[in-house]
């Protein structure tokens, strides 16, 4: 049976682990308000409509300042996972708005990966509602606020 790899990726503290838990309908990943809670990747295999899926929760990565040893390691791991991904869920934080890291990441994903869905998370604040359409400026083909 074919295994389909789905990768949840984005910068730190955008809600990747929350999305992971919600998609699985259980608390599998640790969730915390402090950035950097997830330091490695986690995955769960499950069936959906007869398809075998592997859903990955990844550590947040900062493409623009990979100076720390941990950040370099995270970038390397995520890059390896990206090459095997059949679908990428790129999560951004609408509450705090897009960052230069989000823009750089979107450019990288558009250039090298075709099956990327943009997930605009944290729409529960006034600022997020005011800037509702901002994530669409990243130009990813599939976008979900």
Label each region the model flagged.
Residues 1-69, 81:
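Conserved G1/Walker A P-loop phosphate-binding module
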Residues 114-117, 122-145:
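Canonical P-loop GTPase G-domain recognition
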Residues 4, 84-88, 112-116, 139-142:
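Short glycine-/polar-rich loops that comprise or flank the Walker A/P-loop
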Residues 37-40, 52-54, 58-108, 127:
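Switch II of P-loop NTPase G domains
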Residues 13, 95-96, 123-124:
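Short, glycine/serine-rich, charged loops/turns that create anion-binding
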Residues 8, 90, 118-120:
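Structural beta-sheet core signal
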